[in-house]
């Protein structure tokens, strides 16, 4: 006997994807996440494709995963998807040391971040 299915935390017209352990500070990742919040999924993909930020490649991969989840797992229309949420969280922080003068050492922090993207299917307003 298997366990009963867990109740879905998102509404039926939403799908999500999570990217963890992204090697960038949450502050820098949030700059790229702000570009796509509230945009149509196709426009957000185009923005990320031409962004000059290094982390935009990973954000684009996560957005493509959210779109694929919406299409394959939840049978949503890809052309009607909008990025409803793109929020950034802190991950772990690796601490490294670098030699300094007079026998001392300095700390270097190497932060990681997490990204959650939620896409929602919107009904087109008939004009």
Curated annotation (Swiss-Prot):
| InterPro entries according to UniProt | Ribosomal_uL22 (IPR001063), Ribosomal_uL22_bac/chlpt-type (IPR005727), Ribosomal_uL22_bac/org-type (IPR047867), Ribosomal_uL22_sf (IPR036394)
**For this chain's UniProt record, which GO biological process terms are given?**
translation
Q: Tell me the SUPFAM superfamilies matching this sequence.
A: Ribosomal protein L22
The UniProt keywords, alphabetically, are: Ribonucleoprotein, Ribosomal protein, RNA-binding, rRNA-binding
Query: What's a single GO CC term here?
Result: cytosolic large ribosomal subunit
> Per its record, what are the GO molecular function terms?
rRNA binding; structural constituent of ribosome
Q: Which Pfam families match?
A: Ribosomal_L22
Supply the Gene3D superfamilies for this chain. Ribosomal protein L22/L17
Which protein family is named in the record? Answer: Belongs to the universal ribosomal protein uL22 family.
Question: What is the recorded name of this protein?
Answer: Large ribosomal subunit protein uL22
Organism whose genome encodes this protein: Rhodopseudomonas palustris (strain ATCC BAA-98 / CGA009)
